[in-house]
Amino acid sequence: MAGIFYFALFSCLFGICDAVTGSRVYPANEVTLLDSRSVQGELGWIASPLEGGWEEVSIMDEKNTPIRTYQVCNVMEPSQNNWLRTDWITREGAQRVYIEIKFTLRDCNSLPGVMGTCKETFNLYYYESDNDKERFIRENQFVKIDTIAADESFTQVDIGDRIMKLNTEIRDVGPLSKKGFYLAFQDVGACIALVSVRVFYKKCPLTVRNLAQFPDTITGADTSSLVEVRGSCVNNSEEKDVPKMYCGADGEWLVPIGNCLCNAGHEERSGECQACKIGYYKALSTDATCAKCPPHSYSVWEGATSCTCDRGFFRADNDAASMPCTRPPSAPLNLISNVNETSVNLEWSSPQNTGGRQDISYNVVCKKCGAGDPSKCRPCGSGVHYTPQQNGLKTTKVSITDLLAHTNYTFEIWAVNGVSKYNPNPDQSVSVTVTTNQAAPSSIALVQAKEVTRYSVALAWLEPDRPNGVILEYEVKYYEKDQNERSYRIVRTAARNTDIKGLNPLTSYVFHVRARTAAGYGDFSEPLEVTTNTVPSRIIGDGANSTVLLVSVSGSVVLVVILIAAFVISRRRSKYSKAKQEADEEKHLNQGVRTYVDPFTYEDPNQAVREFAKEIDASCIKIEKVIGVGEFGEVCSGRLKVPGKREICVAIKTLKAGYTDKQRRDFLSEASIMGQFDHPNIIHLEGVVTKCKPVMIITEYMENGSLDAFLRKNDGRFTVIQLVGMLRGIGSGMKYLSDMSYVHRDLAARNILVNSNLVCKVSDFGMSRVLEDDPEAAYTTRGGKIPIRWTAPEAIAYRKFTSASDVWSYGIVMWEVMSYGERPYWDMSNQDVIKAIEEGYRLPPPMDCPIALHQLMLDCWQKERSDRPKFGQIVNMLDKLIRNPNSLKRTGTESSRPNTALLDPSSPEFSAVVSVGDWLQAIKMDRYKDNFTAAGYTTLEAVVHVNQEDLARIGITAITHQNKILSSVQAMRTQMQQMHGRMVPV
């Protein structure tokens, strides 16, 4: 009976050999300790009992490769206890191992007469040991892991049909602590074959995350344990934050923390830090990519941290590596000198070439040259004074004083910037040579009392430092101290000394001396105070009287103290006055209109974002649904809940994944623009999210969406007053932008958003600046083509965008609103629109459009931009219309359907023509005179009722001719209405 069962097992094994001998490729996070299928030769496991229990059997696969299996089938005898033990298995540091068993098992119900003795399970045991040579099975040493049951068992029918029913069970055991272990299989009466046994442990395989390498890491002892592993930065990188990850029990890496950054000169590519390519550089250890060398610089090796400047170009010490290399400026232009006696005023113009820098300043070099040989010049010295200063001038003019008279001077004006010191070149300066005129002498520096008596004082003095010519005489002014110059006397002398006689004894006198040349008198000297005495004595020379000297010196000291005090007080008052003036000026400026700041002028665009937009924590934002797709990514609606404030609905613009630095900069530039605006008719920026992905712009939510779609959806539902109110709101927002010197460039109904209260707000501030800078982009911007139908002709032709071109676009928006979102110029091509505008055609009034509104549209569409109204005037006009609703009741047409012909402002006056022929000749369409006559249109009253179908019917098929005729018809109809008093003036 046992032999029959064995045959059944063998037959089954032959049927499954293909399934167990395929290529043995295991997951990367599993390390195999034992695989019975990979053992060459016999397994040689120990069985107990040695006979009649587990038996090793070899079968051949389809490649004639032997497969070693163990089987047992003692189902006829009760109380079976057959053991099979593996060889010693090293654990290699693993604390938890997994046992994968593949086996087949016979269904006991398919065996006759074995109901009491046949089993369908077997037991799995393990035993830890440091001894790898144990020869016997000691059952009491083993710890049971589990009882293994088959999910599927086979029958005699399966054997006949060669149906594979292979079971696979995996069990784990741990924690393990000894060097190795044994596994054991206990049979208690089953008919079973062990096809394969694999023992393995799990590890988290070597990986690189955030530029940090994490080594192979064996999982922890528990099924829920996490092993913290510190990573090491890859080559050419450094730690920003300590890189760590956790190895999970399933062999998967979890929760990366920290990261490494590529060193300067390297960027991340494919998880590695690779050197910047030639022509690129990276200055700092950041997560940025290598940047192309700035203008006028290059790199000739890989891994450059900065770029070398081209010859003749330099980089200042405080210039960032990202800044272009620059060069010194050229010389100032148009130097003009103006000599006034011994003063010179110099003025000049800025250099033609600033070297590419904004930090330009000017230095003045003064040289005094000999009259006989102008080439022999020497520096002027410290006696010359410059206003406001000699070096570092920010203005283009300077005043130079205290020069010598009748002297040749050469002045050099040097234009310098941050890199001038690297290449001082005479080409950076311009010079002028002047000769000073005659001038009064300078003041006398020192006056002394040589001798003092009861009735006289002997004075002596030095020549002025700058006589500025021949001294003709000196003038001495003196008076009694207590008279305070109310009564003084004058003495003149050609010498540098004089005796003043006839003085009163014991009286204090004050003396002043000045010199005169042919140019006039110089300034008086500082006052000298002397007191006469009763006893003759000499002040200077032999035996000076100590009392008189003390009085004189004391008086001088007191006078000096007084002068210093007066000077300090004067300076304080001057500083206060200046500070007060500056404060007043600052106050005045702050009360003025804010001016828009172009974020593209910032060297670091992120600085503009930080300055004008508020950073919002991403946790405060809840995205609810996608409401549209923009140029940079999806547009969603959601909610914003900032701590301390109520929750509000918001619109969320997201930046799509895989963006470039330029796309991120362009995306956030709109936030930098919106953040500067604060007006009820301008879309409000709530803030930005830049510190995590996705990058987002958060604005207020406008429930009714874009104005054009909203109007089309609600065609005919609003009163004229409501429509004018919408236009007034748009105009008010545009007036605010215009006052801030901001040009929108893309004003259209599609870029106006409407909230639940029908308040219209201007939006979409992302129009590209490339139009101004790139002559090749005549019709192309970053977002696509220029909106020809909304754009002023000078902006199309010359890329000249101004507030006046925005006014043109506003007129188109008015037409869109009054036509309930109809497409401007209908199905005409862009080229036809451009041609029609150039020829003077304009859009006709929409159906039921008040004449006053259409006239305002025509004003906005004046060809000369200076003839168009300002936004402030537009708002005032709309206010008048709203206050006078009767002015909105007269419309330009009584037609029951919209007019689709362009209006020609050059149509002739109705009063100037008397017949259909005259009219056609006036508009240069007299070729169609016979067509009109044949169709019965013989009077002007009949002509004003024709439409496009009528023209086609009488044989006028050219679209441009139809438009021209219908435009003139519309103008005549309007003139006829005016003649009959049907228009109400505003």
UniProtKB/Swiss-Prot annotation:
Domain Fibronectin type-III, residue spans: 328-439, 440-537
EC numbers, comma separated: 2.7.10.1
Extracellular side: 20-547
Record key words, sorted: ATP-binding, Cell adhesion, Cell junction, Cell membrane, Cell projection, Developmental protein, Endosome, Glycoprotein, Kinase, Membrane, Neurogenesis, Nucleotide-binding, Phosphoprotein, Postsynaptic cell membrane, Receptor, Repeat, Signal, Synapse, Transferase, Transmembrane, Transmembrane helix, Tyrosine-protein kinase
UniProt xrefs under PROSITE patterns: EPH_LBD (PS51550), FN3 (PS50853), PROTEIN_KINASE_ATP (PS00107), PROTEIN_KINASE_DOM (PS50011), PROTEIN_KINASE_TYR (PS00109), RECEPTOR_TYR_KIN_V_1 (PS00790), RECEPTOR_TYR_KIN_V_2 (PS00791), SAM_DOMAIN (PS50105)
Compartmental location: Cell membrane; Cell projection, Axon; Cell projection, Dendrite; Postsynaptic density membrane
Function noted in UniProt: Receptor tyrosine kinase which binds membrane-bound ephrin family ligands residing on adjacent cells, leading to contact-dependent bidirectional signaling into neighboring cells. The signaling pathway downstream of the receptor is referred to as forward signaling while the signaling pathway downstream of the ephrin ligand is referred to as reverse signaling. Highly promiscuous, it has the unique property among Eph receptors to bind and to be physiologically activated by both GPI-anchored ephrin-A and transmembrane ephrin-B ligands including EFNA1 and EFNB3.
Domain notes: The protein kinase domain mediates interaction with NGEF.
Name used for this protein in its record: Ephrin type-A receptor 4
Species annotation: Homo sapiens
